[in-house]
């Protein structure tokens, strides 16, 4: 047979084609202590002991390949990127580096993996073929950044006994993308190299474990080794008042107006005096004036009258929105003086005035047997004008915290009731985050502008100091900072990326503890902002359906959450609501939940619900939510007002009586284990570092467990050194 002859032009063409094509590199094998990693340099597909864990990307040209027994590196010339893989025990460290700005895709979920675990809030584990999760993730979580949208910068995948976890040691500038294809969720990951991160390396740790919490525990170990994890015990040692959080339920006290209807002792006299002042009546709406004319006003009419009266009081001495807490406290004192002079003989003693944060409410909490509470005020004016209540609450051992925020600045006069957004115009303009188009980044709700936390730090220090001094609070809830929300800021005066912005948020929060000695909480309590925080709200029940009109806008919808009215008990916080089946499954179904966050931070940050989603918001699943909180050993959160004490206080007492003794026993213990006891997730067990166990039966049927009968909707409590007991919901 004659040999194949190739003419010179054809040969040249073939050589050029071969050079242009990706250079196929043989798969690399790295042998760990018990695991064998197979890595394709051209696609970055990865298998562990012959199980594929990343399908990688389309093939890329490879050069400069070097390899050793425990590591290898190579170059992707077309992407101007360098790749390094290195064993760390049985973990694999993957490092990507690029000297030029670019987005670099590196991971895709292989088809053999059937379940994903992620911390959108506390933690979820779901099938990639579940129809509810296909809809929820596809519609609301299709694109996630890993420093903000994920509360832990990791995800796990499994298809059986072993769990494969991707832990982002570089949590910034990453994006996860979900797509839907063939009735299955597909997941991919990419990293952005830019001038904001100065092309710093992206490092991810791939770890293998035998249970669903393995990745979270490995992340905790890594944080501790890096000095980025701090125990509650250490935090309390620096600020002893923090110990008041042990066993404490969390309560928001609503209503910051000066007077409540229960402060009136002579209704006929009040009606007569108001009707004698035509100028005063101009502050009352038509409906309020009708109530004022009633012979014997019913409670609902009294509430209307008080709304008009409080508006009248505010109009007599307007609050200087731009002048800060000290000036505002002086105006609030003048209002009290004005009311005493004009109406004092018709009212109870001034010490007992008030709506949410008031002496009668504090006394009611004490008389109900509630010994440990965190009390928050949604507006700092309540704390400024209710000194008697603040002092009484702290004497009883409660924490009293005000809400504050430095995230958005609005123009003067645009919304004077939004006190935290009243940032001096010069600071608001100078510190506004600038988008790539050169325009300020719109603030919360599209109003004003979002602010760079580093730029506003001097102003924030000054105002927080004023607030602490003027109000006497011993706690502070600093909104947004704990979420790790960050973006690239193109403002030449303070240009920075996500990592620097989150560092600035942490610096602001750390200052509160170091200088003001306040017990600090914030929203979410993201892993990247956990170190300065003692508590946070938003992980146990996280926000969902933000764009769902049936929940947010359509008042006749059965799923409507409520209006932001009335001020003393806004419907959105107090009105019972139903859940759409999608959210009942994805956000609240115990079988779809996983204590990932608690496995990392149970003994570091106390975490509860988002204030829009308190324990009483959804009556249909009230028992399941309470039981899940006990299983995870996390505090309940309840919205309360003076007018809702009768209906809500017994619920708070029940929740607190069950939670407090468990938390007092377990607050400083790590959550180290979790398992289903029935195979379907209706009976679940958590295990703590001292050997204590909690077992929750979410079903309506009894089950025999280790020789013990566990009825439906009950919690089995097996604390170290104590007899086994049962709690009923």
Enumerate the language-model features and the residues they cover.
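Bacterial N-terminal signal peptides that target proteins for export
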Residues: 1-13
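Active-site-proximal substrate-binding groove within the catalytic cores of carbohydrate-active enzymes
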Residues: 39-46, 186-205, 209-213, 258-268, ...
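An acidic- and aromatic-residue-enriched active-site/binding cleft used to recognize and process polar
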Residues: 99, 109, 377-382, 403-410, ...
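Active-site-adjacent "subsite" loops/lids of carbohydrate-active enzymes
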Residues: 340-342, 347-354, 402-466
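Accessory recognition modules or surfaces
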Residues: 361, 373-375, 381, 385, ...
């Amino acid at each position: 047979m004659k040999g194949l002859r190739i003419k010179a032009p054809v040969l040249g063409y073939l050589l050029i084609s071969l050079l242009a094509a990706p250079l196929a590199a043989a798969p690399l094998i790295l042998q760990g202590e018990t695991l064998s990693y197979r890595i394709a340099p051209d696609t970055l597909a990865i298998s562990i002991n012959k199980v594929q864990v990343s399908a990688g990307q389309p093939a890329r040209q490879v050069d400069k390949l070097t390899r050793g027994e425990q590591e290898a590196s190579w170059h992707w010339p077309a992407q101007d990127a360098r790749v390094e893989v290195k064993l760390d025990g049985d973990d694999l460290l993957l490092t990507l580096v690029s000297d030029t700005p670019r987005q670099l895709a590196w991971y895709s979920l292989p088809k053999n993996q059937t379940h994903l675990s992620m911390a959108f809030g506390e933690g979820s584990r779901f099938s990639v073929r579940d129809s509810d999760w296909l809809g929820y993730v596809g519609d609301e979580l299709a694109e996630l950044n890993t420093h903000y949208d994920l509360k832990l910068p990791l995800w796990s995948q499994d298809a059986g006994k072993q769990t494969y976890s991707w832990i982002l040691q570089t949590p910034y500038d990453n994006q996860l993308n979900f797509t839907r294809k063939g009735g299955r969720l597909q997941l991919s990951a990419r990293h952005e190299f830019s001038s904001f991160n100065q092309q710093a390396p992206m490092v991810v740790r791939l770890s293998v474990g035998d249970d669903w919490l393995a990745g979270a525990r490995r992340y905790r170990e890594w944080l501790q080794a890096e000095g980025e994890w701090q125990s509650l015990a250490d935090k309390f040692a620096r600020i002893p008042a923090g110990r008041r959080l042990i066993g404490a339920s969390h309560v928001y006290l609503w209503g910051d107006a000066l007077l409540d209807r229960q402060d009136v002792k002579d209704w006929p006299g009040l009606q007569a005096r108001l009707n004698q002042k035509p100028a005063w009546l101009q502050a009352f709406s038509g409906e309020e004036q009708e109530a004022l004319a009633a012979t014997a006003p019913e409670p609902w009419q009294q509430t209307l009258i008080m709304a008009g009266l409080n508006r009248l009081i505010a109009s007599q001495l307007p609050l200087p929105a731009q002048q800060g807490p000290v000036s505002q406290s002086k105006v609030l004192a003048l209002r009290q003086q004005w009311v005493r002079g004009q109406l004092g003989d018709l009212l109870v003693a001034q010490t007992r005035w008030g709506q949410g944060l008031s002496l009668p409410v504090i006394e009611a909490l004490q008389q109900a047997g509630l010994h440990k509470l965190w009390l928050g005020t949604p507006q700092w004016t309540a704390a400024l004008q209710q000194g008697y209540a603040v002092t009484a609450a702290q004497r009883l051992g409660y924490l009293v915290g005000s809400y504050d925020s430095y995230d958005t600045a609005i123009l003067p006069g645009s919304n004077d009731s939004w006190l935290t957004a009243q940032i001096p115009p010069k600071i608001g303009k100078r510190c506004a985050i600038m988008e790539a188009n050169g325009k300020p980044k719109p603030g919360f709700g599209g109003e004003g502008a979002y602010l760079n936390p580093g730029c506003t730090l001097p102003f924030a220090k000054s105002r927080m100091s004023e607030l602490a001094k003027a109000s006497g609070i011993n706690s502070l809830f600093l909104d947004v900072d704990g979420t790790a929300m960050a973006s690239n800021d193109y403002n030449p005066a303070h240009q920075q990326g996500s990592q620097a912005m989150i560092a600035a948020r942490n610096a602001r929060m750390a200052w509160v503890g170091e200088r003001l000695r306040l017990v600090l909480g914030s929203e979410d309590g993201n892993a990247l902002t956990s170190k300065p925080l003692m508590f946070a709200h938003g992980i146990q029940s996280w926000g969902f359906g933000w764009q769902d009109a049936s929940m947010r806008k359509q008042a006749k919808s059965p799923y409507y959450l409520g209006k932001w009215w009335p001020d003393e008990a806004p419907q959105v916080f107090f009105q019972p609501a139903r859940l759409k089946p999608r959210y009942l499954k994805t956000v609240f179904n115990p079988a779809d939940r996983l204590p990932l966050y608690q496995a990392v931070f149970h003994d570091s940050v106390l975490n509860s619900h988002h204030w829009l989603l308190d324990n009483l918001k959804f009556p249909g699943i009230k028992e399941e939510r309470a039981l899940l909180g006990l299983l995870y050993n996390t505090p309940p959160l309840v919205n309360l007002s003076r007018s809702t004490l009768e209906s809500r206080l017994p619920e708070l007492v029940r929740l607190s009586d069950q939670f407090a003794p468990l938390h007092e026993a377990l607050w400083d213990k790590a959550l180290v284990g979790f398992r289903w006891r029935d195979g379907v997730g209706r009976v679940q067990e958590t295990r703590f570092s001292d050997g204590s166990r909690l077992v929750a039966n979410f079903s309506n049927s009894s089950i025999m467990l280790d020789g013990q009968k566990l009825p439906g909707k009950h919690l089995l409590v097996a604390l170290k050194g104590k007899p086994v007991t049962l709690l009923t919901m």
